[in-house]
Amino acid sequence: MMKHYIKGGNETKKGTKKQLPKPIIIIVNKVLPVIVLLVAGFFFIPYVSMNFQNNDVKGLNTKAEAVMFYNSICSHCQKVYPKIFWHNVLNFNNESKQIQTINVQNTNNKHYLADFAIQATPTFMKTTNINQRLVSTNSQQIKQFIQTRGH
C-alpha cells in the first residue's frame, strides 16, 4: 500500500510558524498600550481629581476667573467636572482663566455652603462679584458665564 501526500495538505512543517510583520508587532506591543493608557487616563484623571483633590480649600482664589462649587457624588457635577478639569489643564499657565473647584461634600469645605448661600451644585460664581452665579451643566451657558466679566 502506497501513501499519497497531497501538496499543501494538512501536513505542517516544523519551524515554519507564521509571524506578524515587524511593524504590526511594534504597534501591538508598544503603541497600542500607550494609546489605551492615554484614553483611560483621559477619563480616570478627572475622576481622581474630583474625588481626591479640592478637599481642604483655604479660601477663594481671587485671581481665578470663577469658582465651581460641586459635590463629588452629584450626577450633574460628575457630568460637568471633567470639562472644567480639562479647561484648567489647558489654561494651567494663566491663573486668571482658571476655574477654582471646591468640593462642598468634604467636611473641610461645607462652610462654603453657608458662606456663599450655595443651594445647588454645581454652582459657578465669579470671584470678582459673588452675586454673579450660574447653576448649570450646559457647556454653552458655562462658557458664556466664564467669558462675561464679573462686575
Predicted regions and their residues:
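N-terminal leader/targeting and pre-domain segments
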Residues: 2-62, 147-151
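Local sequence-structure signature of Cys/Sec-based thiol-disulfide redox active-site neighborhoods
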Residues: 54-94
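Short acidic active-site motifs
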Residues: 56, 108-112, 141
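Thiol-based oxidoreductase modules, predominantly thioredoxin-like and allied folds used
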Residues: 69-71, 93-110
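Extracytoplasmic/secreted cell-surface and envelope-processing proteins
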Residues: 77-78, 109-112, 133-136
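Extracytoplasmic/secreted envelope proteins and their assembly/folding machinery
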Residues: 81, 85, 113, 139, ...
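Short Fe-S-cluster ligation motifs
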Residues: 104-122
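Non-catalytic, surface beta->alpha helical segment in thiol-disulfide oxidoreductase systems
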Residues: 120, 125-151
